[in-house]
C-alpha cells in the first residue's frame, strides 16, 4: 500500500515538473523586447547624370562593410499563430568606398569618397509561428540614414565635405528562434531604398550632385523578451 502511494506521489510530481518545464520552454511572444544585432551591408551610393560645365558626371560607390545595431519594440499576439510587432532600431556602420568620377564616360580628376554612418528605422512586423519556438516574419517601414561624402578635385586642388540624412523605406524578411527561456536568435535580410538627394557643391557653383542610395543587409541578432 505504501509502495503504491509512493509511486503515485512520484507520478504526480513528475507530471507537475514536466508541465512546468513545458510551460517555461514556450516563450510568450507578446510584450516588449530589446535586442542587439550585427551583420554586413552592401550599400550603393550612386551619383548619376550630375551636370556641370556642360558635362555629365557619374560615380558609383560601393560602401560595403560591417554594422552593429540595437532595437526595441512591442509584439501583440493576434491569435495562436500570428504576431504583430512594432520596432524602432538604430544601426552604426563601418562602410566606405571611393570612386573616380566619369566625365561623359571618361575618367576625370575628381574622386568621390562616400560612407554610410548611421541609420534609424521605424518598422512594422508581421510574423507567423510555425511552432511554439519558431517565428517567420516580414517587416517594412520608414528608414533614414546619415551619409558622408568627400569630393576631391586634382585641378584645381580643392575638396569639399558634406554630411546629410537621406529618407526612404525598408522591407525585409527573416526568422526568430526561441533557443533559451526569454531569448530568441534572429536572422534577417533587409532591403532599403533611401532615394535620391541633391548635394549642392559650393566649389562647383552649387551644382547639384544627385546621390541615390540603396542597401542590402544581412543581420544576426539576439532578442530578450520581457
What are these model-derived regions, one by one?
Residues 1-23:
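Gram-negative bacterial Sec-dependent N-terminal signal peptides
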Residues 3, 22-226:
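Gram-negative outer-membrane beta-barrel domains
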